[in-house]
Amino acid sequence: MIAKCGVKLDYSKSGITSHVSSSVTGGDFDFNDISDTFLTLAALSPLLKTPLSIHGISHTRKQETDRVSGMVNQLKKIVDHVEESDDSIRIVPDGDFFKKAINKPIEIETYEDHRFAMSFAILGSFDLLGNNQPWLRIIDPMCCTKTFPNFFKTLDFCRTKVENGQ
């Protein structure tokens, strides 16, 4: 799935190294069998150069929260064009809209759902404005401690490895 978007992963004994093409694209993906992970790809959609369609996710409306509507509501704070149906979402990223819209950190609601906190934290770790300033604020980020107590420590470790060129 991520290879189709333009990301190549190399696996070794020391870990996983990702190689991202200069033009990371969206696509059309069925998440029915891996529905818990749709939030991560959807949250990363502002990084894409082309539209992203995710379907097979209607049953996620009945989890900790209505994950489809919740994701759409949060993405509308970042992306100009997001469509929702019973079973899908479609996101049309626009980097220019996104960068113009940020004059203070965008607040992301987690709905006390760990997957929202973790998915948007990954997006927030990117320095999209190129000024090394926070541009995303996650409300109740620690709701993820019930499933991944060291998530933010691990994310910070991964970022440190990238920033140091390792």
Indicate residue ranges for each PLM-predicted region.
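Short, structured segments at the rim of ligand-binding sites
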Residues: 1-166
